[in-house]
Amino acid sequence: MSDTRFESCIKCTVCTTACPASRVNPGYPGPKQAGPDGERLRLKDGALYDEALKYCINCKRCEVACPSDVKIGDIIQRARAKYDTTRPSLRNFILSHTDLMGSVSTPFAPVVNTATALKPVRQLLDYALKIDHRRTLPKYSFGTFRRWYRSVAAQQAKYKDQVAFFHGCFVNYNHPQLGKDLIKVLNAMDTGVQLLSKEKCCGVPLIANGFTDKARKQAISNVESLREAIAVKGIPVIATSSTCTFALRDEYPEVLDVDNAGLREHIELATRWLWRKLDAGKTLPLNPLPLKVVYHTPCHMEKMGWTLYTLELLRQIPGLELTVLDSQCCGIAGTYGFKKENYPTSQSIGAPLFRQIEESGADIVVTDCETCKWQIEMSTSKRCEHPITLLAQALG
């Protein structure tokens, strides 16, 4: 299904210039050599696969920069899935199986959160699993978003206009409040929120950690649920995570060969959906929110080209002073920055962004990506929130 267009590469190396990983990691050959150049060799002999492709962080900034529309990131991810014979480690299993880890951790969240914050536990994880002890581990919620949603499902069904919410792992296991904030905002626009009948992790962590077959199975399952919402019920699907949105729309057909034809155009980021409704005449009774905020553009948001919608939505909040940070990778790249061997590179990639944030004088940082939030809050002194949360606060 995927046409990576690797033969269209004109060898200009602008992709390497845009690559945050090759800038700080001399062990990574860069997207041109790892992507279209390497693909020509791999097609002749798969034994020419370069293990250094594991250093690609799949940010897609190479694809944004490419003047020939070569899908460089897709080439690299597909090559890793096809040629890499390395058996995934226990560490990579734990980092990538977010539904499993979330389902076993949320019932014991207070204990899990306390334990993973202890220095001896983090040192043990570093020694035994190579999860870097310097990395702050995400906190789990005591109870999932889906469980909470049952208490409001009947109320949500009363609204004439409906959307389906792909909540993702972050909202379900780590931060249900974001899902509650979204419901509050959509209800203020006379729109009810449904959940998909069955939802699994979007699959991005699985792809990144060598579990491509598992990611494909989950994608097929998710597409069935998406089709039920879009084609059967006739309602759009929205997500608060820029990476989940990107995966559902683009990674499924381009990397996993899972057909989402007829669905893709009905899947969008929550901020984009909200802005389109406001632009069409809907209103939100927003109160002043006197905050100085800076917005960080996630890499996959940059790839989709949807930053404008979030920015215009934030500008609707009275009293909000908004500054857009330079578009650059924060460095965490999902599970990449949790790994001991990648931690120094992860922090080096993000260092310019961290400096800009600290020098901004902002009250908080705003972004549409949950892992960017984790990285920014760990690496700076600033709190980081989702734009939907600010809208919910402005509603009072």
Residue ranges and their predicted role:
Residues 3, 8-10, 14-39, 50, ...:
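Iron-sulfur cluster-binding cysteine motifs and their immediate structural context
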